[in-house]
C-alpha cells in the first residue's frame, strides 16, 4: 500500500480534501499563488495531479465553461501551490458534480490540500449534488460558494456536516437555496467563519 493510500485510509472523507481554480460563466481566470514545487517520491509518480484529474472531469462535463477551464488547466505547465476553482453558471447538474467528486477522490492528499476556494454557484445541483460534493470536499478548503444551487435541507445538512469538520473553512456562501429557516439557523451557528445563508 502506498503512503498516500495509507494516509487516506486513516482519514475520514471530510478530512481528505484541499484544492483551488477560478472560472466564471463568460470568462475564467486561473488564480495561483507562487510556491515551491517539490518532486514527489517514486510511489506518487504515477498519480494524476489535481489539474489532470480535473481536466478529465471537466471535459466529460462538456459545457463551454467546463471546456474552457479544462483548456486552461492543460496549458498550465507547472502546478501551482494553490488552486481556486469557480465554475459559476456552468449549467452543471448533480451528475456533473459526481464527475468532479470522482476527480477529487482520485487525487492524492497532498494535491487535494492545494484547493483553496471552490464554487458551483448558480448551477442546479440540488440535494443530490450537494451531498455528493460534501463527501469529497477537502477539510482544508477555505472558501465554498453554493449560491442559487436548488439545495434543500437534505443537501444543506450534508454541507453543514462537512463544514463542522472543515478546519480550514473561513467563508461559506449558500444563500438563495431552498433550505428551511431551521436549516439556515444551523448554518448561522457555525463558528470562526463568515456564513452567508
Where are these regions (language model features)?
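N-terminal secretory signal peptides
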Residues: 1-14, 28
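N-terminal export leaders
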Residues: 14-20
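Leucine-rich tandem repeat or coiled-coil scaffolds
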Residues: 20-197
Amino acid at each position: 500500500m502506498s503512503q498516500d493510500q495509507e494516509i487516506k485510509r486513516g482519514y475520514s472523507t471530510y478530512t481528505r480534501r484541499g484544492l483551488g481554480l477560478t472560472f466564471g460563466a463568460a470568462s475564467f481566470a486561473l488564480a495561483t499563488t507562487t510556491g515551491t514545487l517539490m518532486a514527489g517520491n517514486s510511489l506518487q509518480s504515477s498519480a494524476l495531479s489535481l489539474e489532470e484529474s480535473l481536466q478529465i472531469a471537466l471535459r466529460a462535463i462538456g459545457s463551454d465553461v467546463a471546456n474552457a477551464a479544462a483548456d486552461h488547466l492543460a496549458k498550465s505547465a507547472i502546478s501551482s501551490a494553490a488552486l481556486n476553482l469557480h465554475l459559476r453558471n456552468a449549467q452543471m447538474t448533480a451528475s456533473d458534480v459526481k464527475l468532479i467528486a470522482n476527480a477529487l477522490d482520485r487525487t492524492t492528499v497532498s494535491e487535494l490540500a492545494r484547493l483553496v476556494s471552490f464554487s458551483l454557484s448558480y448551477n442546479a445541483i440540488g440535494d443530490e449534488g450537494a451531498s455528493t460534493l460534501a463527501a469529497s470536499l477537502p477539510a482544508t478548503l477555505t472558501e465554498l460558494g453554493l449560491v442559487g444551487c436548488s439545495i434543500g435541507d437534505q443537501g444543506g445538512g450534508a454541507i453543514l456536516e462537512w463544514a463542522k469538520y472543515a478546519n480550514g473553512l473561513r467563508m461559506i456562501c449558500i444563500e438563495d437555496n431552498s433550505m428551511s429557516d431551521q436549516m439556515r439557523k444551523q448554518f448561522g451557528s457555525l463558528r470562526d467563519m463568515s456564513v452567508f445563508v
